[in-house]
Amino acid sequence: MAFALIKGLSVHYRVEGPAEAPPLLLIHSLGSSMEMWAPQATALAGKFQVISYDLRGHGLSEATDGSHTLELLAGDALNLLDHLGVERAHVAGVSLGGMIAQTLGIQAGGRVRSLVLGDTASVIGPKSNWDHRAAAIRADGMASLVDAILSRWFTPGFIESQPQIARGFGAMLTRMPAEAYISASCAVRDGDMTAALGHIACPTLVLVGDQDVSTPPAAAEALKAGIPGAKLVVIENAAHIPTVERPEAVTSAMVSFYAGL
């Protein structure tokens, strides 16, 4: 367990793997924590210096008031890399984490060696959905949306066969401060990188669960089409968080991708 006070923000992070290995930054999704990348972090730590962290307002990282933007959250990622003395890193992100990763590839391409964009899109809308979700959370609390969110994160078969994992992620959601979730959701609501995808110049792998209804395979196809040279892998029998639901398949796709760089 490690914490850093970076530009006034307490950030919880973890570094695994040899210090001399290529850095790999893992960015988690809205409402989760760096633990959603735990299987990949462990598997890849032999060949990478794996850096995981909790986004502001998530996990054990400090929350801040007000709406967040992708630029703000991408800045947090760069500040952490600066704190750790990392000039350039491979970057992988899921959902909101994937939007942050896209932002880094577009606005700080010199800092990014490659991108893995999991179950994400250049824009996740419509905006009214996020406003309605925020209103529901403020009215009835985080617990009122847990079942609906879990049904998007995981397939019914996984929830039935691995209830302990699904319930653990549900507990994580329930405990998250409502305003911290809403602040981060504003970054998703307002983000749209569709017109700038062509500026991503690094090798890119797009991953998507075949049963993802939040950012479906069609959105992944659009990312692949918009990013020069991008590759696409569809993870079978997975919804929005394949890193948890199908960890071996995600790790295998990432290992194959990195081997080809």
Stretch-by-stretch model annotation:
Residues 230-261:
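Catalytic active-site module of serine/aspartate enzymes centered on a nucleophile-bearing elbow/loop
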Residues 210-215:
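Acidic catalytic loop of the alpha/beta-hydrolase fold
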Residues 71-89:
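Conserved acidic catalytic loop of the alpha/beta-hydrolase fold
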Residues 9-63:
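Conserved HGGG/HGGXW glycine-rich cap/lid loop of the alpha/beta-hydrolase fold
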Residues 200, 206-208:
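Short beta-strand/loop motif that positions the catalytic acidic residue
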Residues 54, 90, 113-116:
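Residue in the alpha/beta-hydrolase core beta-strand immediately N-terminal to the catalytic nucleophile
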Residues 11, 125-128, 140-199:
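Conserved alpha/beta-hydrolase catalytic His-Asp/Glu region
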Residues 99-146, 153:
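Flexible "cap/lid" loop of the alpha/beta hydrolase fold
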